């Protein structure tokens, strides 16, 4: 659909209402009207179909097996044990018997059919979780560092992020009228949208809060990022980054992944003001005629960073202070138990590709259900698609450990290679309509093929950051990985190499449109050289750059590597 069509749909939607009620009530099809397929995204859902069944249903002269993905708005991915049990029940009753943790710390339900869509939405809201603005041209789910090592400062960080998430919600009551049967006030007219306006944003907008020394949120991949500045265990404020974004288009030189620029420091008191100024600047200056160039990163590149920063400061009435020193050590998760400052413990467990399900050889869904039934602590989803069972007292650890062992949940500690512990993948086939190749379903197979090579060179326990994406939109943030596979066609990928383990450098194209056999053949000699010639503690991506095997792509520096001048 063209940019002009989408902008027209938004503008005429009566604040995201459209004809959704009529589409939902139509029993003759499992799909929505075309315009409503755009609008339902703002309510937290995508219309999809099972692509594994497309050809068979076409032969049977049936419409596609339409279904809906529903995504939650859970800032920082924090939920209670009771909420976990409710989401589990929803997944089992209405979806495909699985919960999917996203790279933005949300939950996704897949396989919901249209006639049960409203009931499912109501069940999610009954858990005191909503889906408003989880998709669409608005601010999406706000990421928050899952690092439990700085408990007091982290609590403030989460509070700020949750407050910002609420502040940036659309003002329309459409969500509550359509899904929760709220009565529209007669004669009230359309609501004002003071932040978004009648056409909302040109494209999606992503925000992340990072807490050094861990960059688990990949803060530089966000349109707007906040890097916590913590002094004497107190959160003073944030270094602000703008202009990150992973999406690109294969073969189109006018699109590219980009990492954000650090533009200065703000105090906590200025968080809402500066964020509003940044979002409204993108609202007014973003490209609404060419959707592939509508993200904030292109607005900055087209108009110039100085111009955009000046506009932001003028709107906010704030002069940004010089950025404060910080250091990122890595962007991964630390598995196992970690003690927080307050004496409580936090257990990080691996969720392969973020999928929580009971399958042959795996009882993740049942295991986490049993832990939730203990009613202790809270669950925190990580930006690496894993889960932290947080806030556990020393005396409660044994009960959790017993269930972890019983249900085999400690895969992070038992994974055969460090690669498996540092891998991510998007959903891709069969549900994502944009996928060109497999990702989530392919990840374990690819890991199994790469494992013997790693063992051959003594690298089985060497952390290497691997990410697989089914298409170039990059939901798994592949362009930051040391090794990335980006889907080009069924069974074929672009091989990207040279990111780092801190989320501060983009990788570059190494081989284009190649098969699994060609990928493994390309990687083996590089891994062999890495084993022989690496420096102590040198990451694979850093090695590739130091030795000249990989060079920075021919883009301006700010699209690819963060300067070290701000590192303490």
From Swiss-Prot:
Assembly with partners or alone: Alpha(8)-beta(8). The alpha component is a flavoprotein, the beta component is a hemoprotein.
Biological function: Component of the sulfite reductase complex that catalyzes the 6-electron reduction of sulfite to sulfide. This is one of several activities required for the biosynthesis of L-cysteine from sulfate.
GO BP annotation list: cysteine biosynthetic process; hydrogen sulfide biosynthetic process; sulfate assimilation
Pathway membership, UniProt: Sulfur metabolism; hydrogen sulfide biosynthesis; hydrogen sulfide from sulfite (NADPH route): step 1/1
GO molecular function: 4 iron, 4 sulfur cluster binding; heme binding; metal ion binding; NADP binding; sulfite reductase (ferredoxin) activity; sulfite reductase (NADPH) activity
Lineage, uppermost ranks: Bacteria, Pseudomonadati, Pseudomonadota, Gammaproteobacteria, Lysobacterales
Cofactor(s) annotated in UniProt: siroheme; [4Fe-4S] cluster
InterPro entries: CysI, NiRdtase/SiRdtase_haem-b_fer, Nit/Sulf_reduc_fer-like_dom_sf, NO2/SO3_Rdtase_4Fe4S_dom, NO2/SO3_Rdtase_4Fe4S_prot, NO2/SO3_Rdtase_4Fe4S_sf, NO2/SO3_Rdtase_FeS/sirohaem_BS
Cofactor detail note: Binds 1 siroheme per subunit.
Residues that bind siroheme: 475
Family affiliation: Belongs to the nitrite and sulfite reductase 4Fe-4S domain family.
Positions annotated to bind [4Fe-4S] cluster: 426, 432, 471, 475
EC number: 1.8.1.2
Protein name: Sulfite reductase [NADPH] hemoprotein beta-component
Enzyme class: oxidoreductase
Membrane-traversing stretches: none
Matches recorded under HAMAP family: CysI
One Pfam family from the record: NIR_SIR
GO cellular component, one term: sulfite reductase complex (NADPH)
């Amino acid at each position: 659909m063209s940019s002009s069509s989408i902008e027209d749909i938004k503008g005429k939607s009566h604040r995201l209402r459209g004809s959704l009620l009529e589409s939902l009530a139509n029993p003759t099809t499992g799909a929505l009207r075309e315009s409503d397929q755009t609008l339902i995204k703002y309510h937290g859902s995508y219309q999809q179909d099972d692509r594994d069944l497309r050809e068979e249903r076409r032969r049977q002269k049936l419409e596609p097996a339409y279904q809906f993905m529903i995504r939650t708005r859970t800032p920082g991915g924090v939920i209670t044990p009771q909420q976990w049990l409710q989401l589990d029940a929803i997944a089992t009753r209405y979806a495909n018997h699985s919960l999917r943790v996203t790279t933005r710390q949300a939950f996704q339900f897949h396989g919901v059919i249209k006639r049960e869509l409203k009931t499912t939405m109501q069940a999610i809201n009954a858990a005191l979780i909503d889906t408003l603005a989880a998709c669409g041209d608005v601010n999406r789910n706000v990421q928050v560092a899952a690092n439990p090592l700085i408990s007091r400062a982290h609590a403030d960080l989460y509070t700020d992020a949750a407050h910002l998430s609420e502040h940036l919600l659309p003002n329309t009551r459409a969500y509550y009228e359509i899904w929760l049967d709220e009565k529209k006030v007669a004669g009230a007219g359309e609501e004002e949208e003071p932040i978004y306006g009648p056409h909302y944003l040109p494209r999606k907008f992503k925000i992340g809060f990072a807490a050094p020394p861990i960059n688990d949120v990949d803060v530089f991949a966000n349109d707007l990022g906040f890097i916590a500045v913590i002094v004497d265990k107190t959160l003073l404020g944030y270094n602000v980054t703008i202009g990150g974004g992973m999406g690109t288009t294969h073969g189109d030189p006018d699109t590219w992944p980009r990492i954000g620029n650090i533009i200065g420091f703000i105090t906590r008191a200025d968080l809402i003001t500066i964020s509003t100024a940044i979002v409204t600047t993108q609202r007014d200056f973003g490209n609404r005629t060419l959707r592939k160039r509508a993200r904030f990163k292109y607005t900055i590149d087209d108009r110039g960073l100085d111009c955009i920063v000046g506009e932001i400061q003028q709107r906010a009435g704030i002069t940004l202070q010089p950025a404060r020193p910080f250091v990122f050590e890595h962007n991964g998760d630390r598995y196992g138990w970690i003690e927080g400052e307050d004496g409580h413990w936090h257990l990080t467990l691996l969720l392969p590709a973020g999928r929580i399900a009971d399958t042959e050889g795996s009882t993740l869904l049942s295991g986490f259900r049993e832990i939730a039934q203990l009613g202790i602590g809270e669950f925190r989803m990580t930006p690496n698609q894993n889960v932290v069972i947080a806030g556990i007292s020393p005396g409660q650890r044994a009960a959790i450990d017993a269930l972890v062992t019983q249900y085999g949940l400690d895969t992070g500690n038992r994974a055969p290679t460090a690669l498996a512990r540092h891998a991510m993948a998007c959903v891709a086939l069969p549900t994502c309509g944009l996928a060109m190749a497999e990702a989530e379903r392919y990840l374990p197979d690819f890991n199994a093929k790469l494992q013997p090579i790693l063992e051959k060179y003594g690298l089985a326990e060497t952390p290497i950051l691997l990410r697989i994406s089914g298409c170039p939109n990059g939901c798994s943030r592949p362009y930051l990985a040391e090794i990335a596979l980006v889907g080009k066609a069924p069974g074929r990928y672009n091989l990207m190499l040279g990111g780092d383990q801190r989320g501060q450098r983009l990788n570059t194209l190494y081989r284009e449109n190649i098969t699994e056999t060609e990928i493994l053949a390309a990687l083996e000699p590089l891994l062999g050289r890495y084993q022989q010639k690496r420096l102590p503690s040198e990451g694979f991506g850093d090695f590739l750059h130091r030795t000249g095997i990989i060079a920075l792509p021919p883009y301006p520096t700010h699209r690819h590597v963060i300067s070290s001048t701000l590192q303490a």
